[in-house]
């Protein structure tokens, strides 16, 4: 596996190549917003973006482990990552809530998340970028042209931690998502290992899982709904 960084015409690029056959599929998923050029994935940032040096250092040090976790070749210590998230944001105005598989896992579902997905406001997205400045693998991105959200952030703290800030109303059309404004208006609070965590309602997560044809996940949610 090889990584390189360069700056051209005011843009600094991060690139990774030579991931190998066993990591090719997870690379396609994790690096889906990178540009693909043959066997290399690359992403550019304005060269004057604050924090690029630490992002590059973190990216190069954790990229292989991150891909191996995504391929399930290495365990994903999501509990450790979530505890660190809770510790770092405790008492601070971060305003995040859980989405995806981790939102089910903290309810007690028999599921092992591959990462931790968060949803928050735009201000909170920037705040998380400050709180995790030492662990960012990409700078927090502000992109109003995205159909999903205005902000994106990614860090690696023993496992991948991703967040979106200010999700767009369009993510709830034609059907509500489990990470958009509809879910945000219906959040529930659960207790997990001493922490109070906000999660979307199970019926929304079930509907999303059914649309994605995640039959095993639907069965897990049904079991929780029938308790």
Question: Which residues fall in each region the model found?
Answer:
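Catalytic core of pol beta-like nucleotidyltransferases
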Residues: 30, 48-50, 55-68, 72-79, ...
């Amino acid at each position: 596996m090889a990584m390189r960084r360069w700056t051209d015409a005011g843009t600094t690029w991060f690139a990774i190549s030579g991931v190998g056959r066993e990591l090719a599929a997870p690379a396609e998923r994790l690096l889906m917003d990178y540009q693909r050029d043959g066997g290399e994935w690359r992403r550019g940032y304005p060269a004057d973006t604050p924090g690029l040096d630490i992002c590059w250092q973190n990216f190069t040090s954790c990229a292989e482990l991150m891909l191996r976790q995504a391929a399930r070749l290495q365990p994903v210590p999501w509990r450790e990552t979530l505890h660190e998230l809770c510790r770092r944001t405790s008492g601070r105005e971060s305003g995040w809530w859980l989405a995806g598989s981790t939102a089910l896992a903290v309810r007690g579902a028999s599921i092992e998340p591959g990462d931790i997905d968060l949803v928050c406001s735009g201000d909170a997205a920037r705040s998380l970028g400050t709180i995790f400045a030492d662990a960012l693998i990409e700078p927090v991105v502000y992109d109003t042209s995205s159909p999903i959200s205005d902000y994106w952030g990614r860090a690696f703290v023993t496992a991948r931690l991703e967040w979106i800030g200010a999700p767009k109303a369009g993510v709830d059309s034609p059907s509500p998502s489990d990470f958009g404004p509809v879910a945000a208006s219906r959040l529930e609070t659960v207790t997990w290992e001493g922490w109070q965590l906000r999660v979307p309602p199970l019926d929304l997560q079930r509907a999303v899982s059914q649309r994605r044809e995640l039959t095993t996940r639907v069965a897990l949610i049904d079991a929780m709904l029938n308790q």
